[in-house]
Amino acid sequence: MAAARHSTLDFKLGAKADGEAILKGLQSIFQEQGMTESVHTWQDHGYLATYTNKNGSFANLRIYPHGLVLLDLQSYDSDVQGKQETDSLLNKIEEKMKELSQDSTGRVKRLPPIVRGGAIDRYWPTADGRLVEYDIDEVVYDEDSPYQNIKILHSKQFGNILILSGDVNLAESDLAYTRAIMGSGKEDYTGKDVLILGGGDGGILCEIVKLKPKMVTMVEIDQMVIDGCKKYMRRTCGDVLDNLRGDCYQVLIEDCIPVLKMYAKEGREFDYVINDLTAVPISTSPEEDSTWDFLRLILDLSMKVLKQDGKYFTQGNCVNLTEALSLYEEQLGRLYCPVEFSKEIVCVPSYLELWVFYTVWKKAKP
């Protein structure tokens, strides 16, 4: 698959930019590459020069009068030689710019190139909108279930990473996530009844069954998530997903909402409810985002099946999303029963951002 390599080079000059001098000084470098120049001039807004090559590569050079000079270079990400030629061109431009500015260059910024349209996508936004490039080197699994797209990609640092509908869910490196959503080692699960909502990667189930619970019930809607993870995420799930029933656990392939309603109607209660379905929505308009309705429904139903002295664990979102997290905490105050909560900030390796986890419990009856 053909991909495009997008390289950037930024200069912040210590003085106003002499656009004509820069264009003249760089012209020979682009000509050596066989590139044709086209220049657009604004009276008060500087210059835009475009350089095109017969091989399909091109460069845009934007010169702002206040001293900012930006170069964008796009070429085929074809072979090692092509990458070396691009790096050589950028090196020559950087050296020439330093010469032309007579050491008045205040700052030079050269970012790693972005490869767009490649067979392996390595870029994801963080929850708060920053771009992250992962060291992905292999697509291990890529299937569409009736509910979502399921990808498992291999990272050199983090091992296999589960990605659901474009969202990074869990990597084999992320035991910190699993421990945090289980109470960070502060809980005694011995002889306890536990309900897991979601958790198709098997990480939570794998860790809890080691702690000798009475029974763990996991409700996961997507069989294909389980199938992919039991084959390609075994450092996370061990062998617990090989069978849907074990000595102290059962996995139900069902929508959790009808199951929660059934348990509530039957009066069934759990010592722990662990919600591993979804993060707190990024949207700060609960009245416009159906995910908030889903979240409130899950919260209310979970409280109905939680014992009076039980605990409810869930993830929040990125620590920087303070407004969304505050809205979530407001929702906790609107449940059918009064609750209290605490939160913990945890570094989950593959998320590349700090993550908030919540513990919720019912207020003691007077």
From Swiss-Prot:
Q: Which GO terms describe its molecular function?
A: spermine synthase activity
State the InterPro entries in the record: PABS (IPR030374), PABS_CS (IPR030373), SAM-dependent_MTases_sf (IPR029063), Spermidine_synt_N (IPR035246), Spermidine_synt_N_sf (IPR037163), Spermine_synthase_animal (IPR015576), SpmSyn_N (IPR040900)
What the record says about disrupting the gene is: Mouse ES cells lacking Sms display normal growth rates but are sensitive to antiproliferative and DNA damage-inducing drugs.
Which residues are noted in the entry as S-adenosyl 3-(methylsulfanyl)propylamine-binding?
A: Q148, E220, D255, C256
Which residues participate directly in catalysis?
Answer: D276
On this chain, the residues bearing N-acetylalanine are: A2
Highest rank taxon of the organism: Eukaryota
**Domain PABS, residue spans:** 122-362
- Written domain comment of the UniProt record: Composed of 3 domains: the N-terminal domain has structural similarity to S-adenosylmethionine decarboxylase, the central domain is made up of four beta strands and the C-terminal domain is similar in structure to spermidine synthase. The N- and C-terminal domains are both required for activity.
Of which family is this protein a member?
Belongs to the spermidine/spermine synthase family.
Name this polypeptide is given: Spermine synthase
Q: Which organism is it from?
A: Mus musculus (Mouse)
Organismal lineage: Eukaryota, Metazoa, Chordata, Craniata, Vertebrata
**Coding gene?**
Sms
